[in-house]
């Protein structure tokens, strides 16, 4: 069974990806599960640059260890708010200065949008996935979800900006959805669906 290494140890993200790719005959592993301890600096100017850098560094590491027959997948995702000219964008995870502090990031976003009218609170989540094979083949897949930023947190599921991201068609935030509902329409879910189509060609 081909190894499919996820360039992440984020438990929420790993669970989401494993659920969506469960129909493939792949041994899907997080970095911890694969015994890989590499910290790749995300200093790219775009989501794709960050994703490719992560995936390719891990690919090179695995090749140096004599590994073969594997795929490494990395994704970079973020929130783009129209009123803020696309911010926080590639800085979404560290918007408030400290990497991965969801509550502080949400607080900062609410502060930035204080007194901003509903029709100016449009936003989208974007996810860009890059998968590289041991032979250096590269697949890029992008997905987006569109919604509005609420004035207060709502819901207990998900992570990141999910409690503020309201999807009008569902009348729910990402944090109020079941994992199946969210996976069907989330930016990562949509990017992974595109990735699945591309993987079929590689896994024949």
From Swiss-Prot:
This enzyme's EC code(s): 3.6.1.66
Cofactor(s) the record lists: Mg(2+)
Active site per the UniProt annotation: 76 (proton acceptor)
InterPro entries (UniProt xref): dITP/XTP_pyrophosphatase, ITPase-like_fam, RdgB/HAM1
Residues reported in the UniProt entry to bind substrate: 8-13, 77, 159-162, 182, 187-188
Keywords: Hydrolase, Magnesium, Metal-binding, Nucleotide metabolism, Nucleotide-binding
Function statement: Pyrophosphatase that catalyzes the hydrolysis of nucleoside triphosphates to their monophosphate derivatives, with a high preference for the non-canonical purine nucleotides XTP (xanthosine triphosphate), dITP (deoxyinosine triphosphate) and ITP. Seems to function as a house-cleaning enzyme that removes non-canonical purine nucleotides from the nucleotide pool, thus preventing their incorporation into DNA/RNA and avoiding chromosomal lesions.
MF-aspect GO terms: dITP diphosphatase activity; ITP diphosphatase activity; metal ion binding; nucleotide binding; ribonucleoside triphosphate phosphatase activity; XTP diphosphatase activity
Cofactor binding comment, as recorded: Binds 1 Mg(2+) ion per subunit.
Chemical reaction(s) catalysed: XTP + H2O = XMP + diphosphate + H(+); dITP + H2O = dIMP + diphosphate + H(+); ITP + H2O = IMP + diphosphate + H(+)
Protein name: dITP/XTP pyrophosphatase
Protein species of origin: Clostridium perfringens (strain 13 / Type A)
Recorded family membership: Belongs to the HAM1 NTPase family.
GO CC annotations on file: cytosol
Binding residue positions for Mg(2+): 41, 76
Complex formation: Homodimer.
Transmembrane regions: none
Listed GO biological process terms: nucleotide metabolic process; purine nucleoside triphosphate catabolic process
SUPFAM superfamilies: ITPase-like
